Amino acid sequence: MKHLYFLLTAIIGFIFNTSCSSPKAETGKSSIITVTIEPLRYFTEAIAGDKFDVVSMVPDGSSPETYDPTPQQLVALAQSQAYFQIGHIGFEQTWIQRLQANTPHLPFYDMSENVPLMEGTCHETHQHNHDHDVDPHIWNSTKNAEIIVKNIYHALCQLDSIHQAYYAHRLDSVTALIRETEQQMQTLMKDADRTFLIYHPALTYFARD
C-alpha cells in the first residue's frame, strides 16, 4: 500500500508539473480552445503554452458523468477555435453531438485517437444507465499520456501551423517529463504488490501498464 501511495503521488505530481510547465492563459486572448475535462486542459496548456487560452466545459470538482453545460458556456463555445474531447466520457456521450450541431463551424478533435482502449464498466448518469464499452479514463496512464500529447500537438499544428516549431519544442519537453515519470513509477513498483482496491474504477489503464 505504501508503494501505491507513492506511485499515485507520482502521477498527481506529473499532472501538476505538466500544468505548471506552461504559462497560465490570460483573460482576453482571442484564440480559445475548449476541452471537456481538467486533465485534458492541463495537457493542452502544456503544449499550447501562451498561444491559446484553454477552458474546460466540465469545471474542476464537477462530475464529467452528470454535468450539464450552462447557457453561458454554450454561447462561449461558439467563440472557440476548436474543441478537444477526451473520447468516451459520459459528458461527451450525452452532449458531443449536440455541441457539434450547435457549432457546425467548429472543428472537434478526439484525443483518444490511437490510444489502445480498454473495456469499461457500467456507470449511472442522471439521464440513463450508460454501459460504457470503453473505459474513458485514458489520461491515468503515462503511456497513454504520450499519445494524448502527440494528438494535441498535431491538432494545434493544424490550427496554427505558423507556430509548429514552438509546439514541437514543448511536446519534446512534456514527453521527456512523461518518460521520467514512467521510470520513477517503474522503480517504485519494482517490489510492490500488483493488486490494489479502489472505489472508483479510474486506474484501469494505470493497472494495465
List each model region and its residues.
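Positively charged n-region of N-terminal signal peptides that target proteins for export
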Residues: M1-L4
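Bacterial N-terminal signal peptides
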Residues: L7-N17
